UniProtKB/Swiss-Prot annotation:
Gene name tied to this protein: Bref-TH
Hydrolase recorded as keyword: yes
Functional summary from the UniProt entry: Thiohydrolase; part of the gene cluster that mediates the biosynthesis of brefeldin A (BFA), a protein transport inhibitor that shows antiviral, antifungal, and antitumor properties. The proposed biosynthesis of BFA involves formation of an acyclic polyketide chain that is differentially tailored throughout the backbone.
Name the record gives this protein: Thiohydrolase
Taxonomic lineage: Eukaryota, Fungi, Dikarya, Ascomycota, Pezizomycotina
Single GO molecular function: hydrolase activity
Family per similarity comment: Belongs to the polyketide transferase af380 family.
Species, as recorded: Eupenicillium brefeldianum (Penicillium brefeldianum)
Pfam families according to UniProt: Hydrolase_4 (PF12146)
Induction note: Coexpressed with the other cluster genes on brefeldin A production optimized medium.
Gene Ontology biological-process entries: antibiotic biosynthetic process; monocarboxylic acid biosynthetic process
Pathway where it operates: Mycotoxin biosynthesis
EC code: 3.1.-.-
Amino acid sequence: MPGRELAPRQNVEFQTLDGLTLRGWLFPAQSRGPAVIITPGFNCVKEMFVSEVAESFQHSDVTALVYDPRTLGDSGGLPRNNIDPLAQVSDYSDALTFLKTLPIVDQTNISFWGMSFSALVALNAAALDKRARCCIAVCPLTGMQPEPDMLPKVLARCMQDRESQVVGNPPVTISVLTEQGRNPAGMGIGADKMEYDYMVNAKFRGAPNYENRTTLQSYYKMMAWQPFEIMKYLSKTRVLMIIPENDTISPADKQQVLFDGLPEPKTAHIAKGKGHLDVLSGADYEILAEMQAYFIKGPRGKGNAPSA
Protein backbone atom coordinates (compact mmCIF):
# COMPACT_ATOMS: atom_id res chain seq x y z
CA MET A 1 0.00 0.00 0.00
CA PRO A 2 1.18 3.61 -0.51
CA GLY A 3 3.45 4.76 2.26
CA ARG A 4 2.10 7.15 4.86
CA GLU A 5 2.70 7.18 8.57
CA LEU A 6 0.06 5.24 10.46
CA ALA A 7 -0.64 4.79 14.14
CA PRO A 8 1.10 1.71 15.54
CA ARG A 9 -1.08 -1.30 16.19
CA GLN A 10 -2.27 -1.71 19.76
CA ASN A 11 -2.63 -4.84 21.88
CA VAL A 12 -6.26 -5.03 23.00
CA GLU A 13 -8.56 -7.44 24.78
CA PHE A 14 -12.29 -7.68 25.38
CA GLN A 15 -14.73 -9.89 27.23
CA THR A 16 -17.25 -12.28 25.73
CA LEU A 17 -20.75 -12.74 27.08
CA ASP A 18 -19.71 -16.05 28.67
CA GLY A 19 -16.70 -14.53 30.41
CA LEU A 20 -13.73 -15.34 28.17
CA THR A 21 -11.02 -12.83 27.33
CA LEU A 22 -10.26 -12.51 23.63
CA ARG A 23 -7.04 -10.79 22.64
CA GLY A 24 -5.87 -9.20 19.44
CA TRP A 25 -4.59 -6.13 17.67
CA LEU A 26 -6.25 -2.82 16.92
CA PHE A 27 -5.12 -0.90 13.83
CA PRO A 28 -6.49 2.63 14.41
CA ALA A 29 -7.49 4.81 11.49
CA GLN A 30 -6.22 8.38 11.20
CA SER A 31 -9.65 9.82 11.90
CA ARG A 32 -12.93 8.81 13.50
CA GLY A 33 -15.00 6.67 11.16
CA PRO A 34 -15.85 3.12 10.10
CA ALA A 35 -14.35 -0.03 11.58
CA VAL A 36 -14.11 -3.68 10.60
CA ILE A 37 -13.80 -6.86 12.68
CA ILE A 38 -11.51 -9.54 11.23
CA THR A 39 -10.78 -13.13 12.27
CA PRO A 40 -8.54 -15.73 10.60
CA GLY A 41 -9.57 -19.05 9.07
CA PHE A 42 -10.21 -22.49 10.57
CA ASN A 43 -7.92 -23.07 13.58
CA CYS A 44 -5.74 -20.15 12.44
CA VAL A 45 -4.29 -17.33 14.52
CA LYS A 46 -4.08 -13.60 13.93
CA GLU A 47 -0.49 -13.76 12.63
CA MET A 48 -1.71 -15.74 9.61
CA PHE A 49 -2.94 -13.70 6.61
CA VAL A 50 -5.15 -11.22 8.39
CA SER A 51 -2.80 -8.67 9.96
CA GLU A 52 -1.89 -7.53 6.43
CA VAL A 53 -5.59 -7.23 5.65
CA ALA A 54 -6.04 -5.05 8.74
CA GLU A 55 -3.15 -2.84 7.66
CA SER A 56 -4.72 -2.35 4.24
CA PHE A 57 -7.95 -1.18 5.86
CA GLN A 58 -5.95 1.13 8.12
CA HIS A 59 -4.30 2.68 5.04
CA SER A 60 -7.83 3.41 3.78
CA ASP A 61 -8.72 5.14 7.07
CA VAL A 62 -10.80 2.24 8.37
CA THR A 63 -10.05 1.08 11.92
CA ALA A 64 -9.48 -2.69 11.99
CA LEU A 65 -9.70 -5.15 14.88
CA VAL A 66 -8.02 -8.54 14.45
CA TYR A 67 -8.24 -11.10 17.25
CA ASP A 68 -7.49 -14.73 17.96
CA PRO A 69 -10.72 -16.75 18.11
CA ARG A 70 -11.52 -18.39 21.44
CA THR A 71 -9.22 -21.26 22.49
CA LEU A 72 -6.60 -20.16 19.92
CA GLY A 73 -3.45 -18.06 20.09
CA ASP A 74 -3.45 -15.39 22.77
CA SER A 75 -7.18 -15.67 23.51
CA GLY A 76 -8.69 -17.52 26.44
CA GLY A 77 -10.74 -20.67 26.45
CA LEU A 78 -10.29 -24.34 27.26
CA PRO A 79 -9.69 -26.90 25.96
CA ARG A 80 -7.21 -25.34 23.57
CA ASN A 81 -7.87 -25.58 19.83
CA ASN A 82 -11.50 -26.46 20.48
CA ILE A 83 -13.32 -24.94 17.50
CA ASP A 84 -16.87 -23.88 18.35
CA PRO A 85 -18.34 -22.06 15.34
CA LEU A 86 -21.53 -20.89 17.03
CA ALA A 87 -19.54 -19.43 19.91
CA GLN A 88 -17.31 -17.69 17.35
CA VAL A 89 -20.42 -16.21 15.74
CA SER A 90 -21.42 -14.79 19.11
CA ASP A 91 -17.91 -13.45 19.68
CA TYR A 92 -18.18 -11.20 16.62
CA SER A 93 -21.05 -9.43 18.37
CA ASP A 94 -18.98 -8.99 21.53
CA ALA A 95 -16.15 -7.59 19.41
CA LEU A 96 -18.61 -5.10 17.91
CA THR A 97 -19.76 -4.09 21.39
CA PHE A 98 -16.11 -3.51 22.31
CA LEU A 99 -15.45 -1.36 19.23
CA LYS A 100 -18.47 0.79 20.05
CA THR A 101 -16.65 1.95 23.20
CA LEU A 102 -13.72 3.40 21.23
CA PRO A 103 -13.79 7.13 20.37
CA ILE A 104 -12.07 6.47 17.01
CA VAL A 105 -15.00 4.32 15.82
CA ASP A 106 -18.31 5.46 14.33
CA GLN A 107 -20.74 3.24 16.27
CA THR A 108 -23.13 3.09 13.31
CA ASN A 109 -20.52 1.89 10.83
CA ILE A 110 -18.93 -1.36 12.03
CA SER A 111 -18.63 -4.29 9.61
CA PHE A 112 -17.64 -7.96 9.73
CA TRP A 113 -14.92 -9.64 7.64
CA GLY A 114 -13.98 -13.30 7.33
CA MET A 115 -11.94 -15.63 5.15
CA SER A 116 -12.54 -19.31 4.40
CA PHE A 117 -14.10 -20.86 7.53
CA SER A 118 -14.32 -17.48 9.23
CA ALA A 119 -16.17 -16.10 6.19
CA LEU A 120 -19.06 -18.40 7.14
CA VAL A 121 -18.75 -17.30 10.76
CA ALA A 122 -18.81 -13.63 9.72
CA LEU A 123 -21.81 -14.16 7.44
CA ASN A 124 -23.71 -15.86 10.27
CA ALA A 125 -22.75 -13.11 12.70
CA ALA A 126 -23.96 -10.44 10.28
CA ALA A 127 -27.20 -12.35 9.73
CA LEU A 128 -27.95 -12.38 13.46
CA ASP A 129 -26.52 -9.01 14.52
CA LYS A 130 -28.16 -6.18 12.62
CA ARG A 131 -25.78 -3.68 14.20
CA ALA A 132 -23.25 -4.81 11.58
CA ARG A 133 -23.36 -2.48 8.61
CA CYS A 134 -22.12 -5.03 6.08
CA CYS A 135 -20.09 -8.23 5.69
CA ILE A 136 -17.15 -9.15 3.47
CA ALA A 137 -16.72 -12.89 2.87
CA VAL A 138 -13.49 -14.01 1.17
CA CYS A 139 -13.39 -17.54 -0.31
CA PRO A 140 -16.03 -18.98 2.07
CA LEU A 141 -15.98 -22.72 2.64
CA THR A 142 -18.89 -24.53 1.03
CA GLY A 143 -18.59 -28.03 2.50
CA MET A 144 -18.89 -28.33 6.26
CA GLN A 145 -19.88 -31.99 6.65
CA PRO A 146 -17.61 -35.06 6.69
CA GLU A 147 -17.61 -37.33 3.67
CA PRO A 148 -20.69 -39.60 3.90
CA ASP A 149 -18.69 -42.79 4.39
CA MET A 150 -16.73 -41.20 7.24
CA LEU A 151 -19.63 -39.59 9.10
CA PRO A 152 -20.60 -42.62 11.25
CA LYS A 153 -16.95 -43.20 12.20
CA VAL A 154 -16.38 -39.57 13.14
CA LEU A 155 -19.52 -39.46 15.29
CA ALA A 156 -18.62 -42.75 16.98
CA ARG A 157 -15.16 -41.44 17.84
CA CYS A 158 -16.69 -38.22 19.18
CA MET A 159 -18.93 -40.20 21.51
CA GLN A 160 -16.01 -42.34 22.70
CA ASP A 161 -14.08 -39.15 23.42
CA ARG A 162 -17.00 -37.72 25.40
CA GLU A 163 -17.15 -40.82 27.58
CA SER A 164 -13.39 -40.63 28.08
CA GLN A 165 -13.46 -36.97 29.12
CA VAL A 166 -16.26 -37.56 31.63
CA VAL A 167 -13.99 -39.89 33.61
CA GLY A 168 -11.16 -37.38 33.63
CA ASN A 169 -9.12 -37.99 30.50
CA PRO A 170 -7.92 -35.09 28.33
CA PRO A 171 -9.72 -34.32 25.06
CA VAL A 172 -8.58 -36.23 22.00
CA THR A 173 -6.93 -34.01 19.38
CA ILE A 174 -6.24 -34.70 15.71
CA SER A 175 -4.28 -32.94 12.98
CA VAL A 176 -6.06 -30.41 10.80
CA LEU A 177 -4.24 -31.77 7.76
CA THR A 178 -2.49 -35.06 7.07
CA GLU A 179 0.67 -35.33 4.98
CA GLN A 180 -1.61 -36.00 2.01
CA GLY A 181 -3.26 -32.61 2.53
CA ARG A 182 -6.52 -34.17 3.72
CA ASN A 183 -8.55 -33.48 6.82
CA PRO A 184 -8.53 -36.68 8.92
CA ALA A 185 -12.16 -36.18 9.95
CA GLY A 186 -13.21 -36.06 6.31
CA MET A 187 -14.26 -32.41 6.34
CA GLY A 188 -14.05 -30.51 3.07
CA ILE A 189 -10.80 -28.84 4.11
CA GLY A 190 -8.13 -30.05 1.72
CA ALA A 191 -4.88 -28.51 0.53
CA ASP A 192 -2.43 -28.84 -2.32
CA LYS A 193 1.31 -29.23 -1.69
CA MET A 194 2.00 -25.50 -1.39
CA GLU A 195 -0.99 -24.91 0.88
CA TYR A 196 -0.09 -27.89 3.05
CA ASP A 197 3.48 -26.62 3.41
CA TYR A 198 2.25 -23.21 4.52
CA MET A 199 -0.20 -24.55 7.06
CA VAL A 200 2.03 -27.12 8.76
CA ASN A 201 4.99 -24.74 8.89
CA ALA A 202 3.10 -21.58 9.90
CA LYS A 203 4.34 -22.02 13.47
CA PHE A 204 7.89 -21.47 12.25
CA ARG A 205 7.02 -18.69 9.79
CA GLY A 206 5.69 -15.89 11.93
CA ALA A 207 2.78 -17.61 13.74
CA PRO A 208 4.38 -19.21 16.83
CA ASN A 209 1.01 -19.84 18.49
CA TYR A 210 -0.33 -21.91 15.60
CA GLU A 211 -0.88 -25.64 16.19
CA ASN A 212 -1.80 -28.09 13.42
CA ARG A 213 -4.38 -29.83 15.59
CA THR A 214 -7.90 -29.43 16.91
CA THR A 215 -9.99 -31.28 19.44
CA LEU A 216 -12.04 -34.12 18.04
CA GLN A 217 -15.11 -32.45 19.56
CA SER A 218 -14.55 -29.55 17.17
CA TYR A 219 -16.02 -31.73 14.42
CA TYR A 220 -19.06 -32.62 16.53
CA LYS A 221 -19.65 -28.88 16.93
CA MET A 222 -19.13 -28.32 13.22
CA MET A 223 -21.70 -30.98 12.34
CA ALA A 224 -24.22 -29.44 14.75
CA TRP A 225 -23.76 -26.04 13.08
CA GLN A 226 -26.07 -25.13 10.21
CA PRO A 227 -24.37 -22.03 8.73
CA PHE A 228 -26.21 -22.01 5.42
CA GLU A 229 -29.62 -21.96 7.12
CA ILE A 230 -28.63 -18.95 9.23
CA MET A 231 -27.59 -16.97 6.16
CA LYS A 232 -31.18 -16.49 5.05
CA TYR A 233 -31.44 -13.87 7.81
CA LEU A 234 -28.91 -11.66 6.00
CA SER A 235 -31.76 -9.78 4.35
CA LYS A 236 -30.99 -6.02 4.18
CA THR A 237 -27.38 -6.54 5.29
CA ARG A 238 -24.98 -5.83 2.43
CA VAL A 239 -22.56 -8.62 1.48
CA LEU A 240 -19.44 -8.55 -0.67
CA MET A 241 -18.17 -12.03 -1.58
CA ILE A 242 -14.71 -12.40 -3.10
CA ILE A 243 -14.36 -15.67 -5.03
CA PRO A 244 -10.88 -16.85 -6.11
CA GLU A 245 -11.09 -18.17 -9.65
CA ASN A 246 -8.66 -21.07 -9.05
CA ASP A 247 -9.74 -22.08 -5.54
CA THR A 248 -9.17 -25.82 -4.98
CA ILE A 249 -10.12 -25.88 -1.28
CA SER A 250 -13.53 -24.27 -1.83
CA PRO A 251 -14.27 -24.51 -5.58
CA ALA A 252 -15.31 -21.27 -7.23
CA ASP A 253 -18.46 -22.77 -8.78
CA LYS A 254 -19.70 -23.85 -5.34
CA GLN A 255 -18.93 -20.43 -3.90
CA GLN A 256 -20.99 -18.94 -6.72
CA VAL A 257 -23.92 -21.20 -5.82
CA LEU A 258 -23.61 -20.04 -2.21
CA PHE A 259 -23.59 -16.42 -3.34
CA ASP A 260 -26.61 -16.93 -5.60
CA GLY A 261 -28.59 -18.18 -2.61
CA LEU A 262 -27.89 -15.14 -0.45
CA PRO A 263 -30.56 -12.46 -0.13
CA GLU A 264 -30.01 -8.99 -1.57
CA PRO A 265 -28.21 -6.62 -1.39
CA LYS A 266 -25.07 -8.48 -2.45
CA THR A 267 -22.05 -8.14 -4.72
CA ALA A 268 -19.67 -10.82 -6.01
CA HIS A 269 -16.15 -10.30 -7.31
CA ILE A 270 -14.16 -13.04 -9.08
CA ALA A 271 -10.46 -12.77 -8.23
CA LYS A 272 -8.88 -13.84 -11.52
CA GLY A 273 -5.98 -16.27 -11.31
CA LYS A 274 -6.16 -16.52 -7.53
CA GLY A 275 -6.42 -19.54 -5.24
CA HIS A 276 -7.64 -20.03 -1.68
CA LEU A 277 -4.43 -19.00 0.08
CA ASP A 278 -3.03 -16.39 -2.33
CA VAL A 279 -6.18 -14.37 -2.93
CA LEU A 280 -4.95 -11.74 -0.47
CA SER A 281 -1.44 -11.42 -1.91
CA GLY A 282 0.35 -10.24 -5.02
CA ALA A 283 0.77 -6.94 -6.81
CA ASP A 284 -2.94 -6.70 -7.62
CA TYR A 285 -4.07 -7.01 -4.00
CA GLU A 286 -4.00 -3.24 -3.59
CA ILE A 287 -6.92 -2.98 -6.01
CA LEU A 288 -8.82 -5.65 -4.09
CA ALA A 289 -8.05 -3.89 -0.80
CA GLU A 290 -9.41 -0.60 -2.14
CA MET A 291 -12.56 -2.39 -3.30
CA GLN A 292 -13.17 -3.76 0.18
CA ALA A 293 -12.55 -0.42 1.88
CA TYR A 294 -14.92 1.29 -0.56
CA PHE A 295 -17.58 -1.29 0.19
CA ILE A 296 -17.33 -0.62 3.92
CA LYS A 297 -17.18 3.16 3.58
CA GLY A 298 -19.75 3.44 0.76
CA PRO A 299 -23.26 4.83 1.12
CA ARG A 300 -25.78 2.79 3.06
CA GLY A 301 -28.02 0.55 1.01
CA LYS A 302 -25.65 0.35 -1.98
CA GLY A 303 -24.11 -3.03 -2.58
CA ASN A 304 -21.71 -2.17 -5.37
CA ALA A 305 -17.95 -1.80 -5.13
CA PRO A 306 -15.60 -0.60 -7.86
CA SER A 307 -14.44 -3.29 -10.25
CA ALA A 308 -10.87 -4.55 -10.23
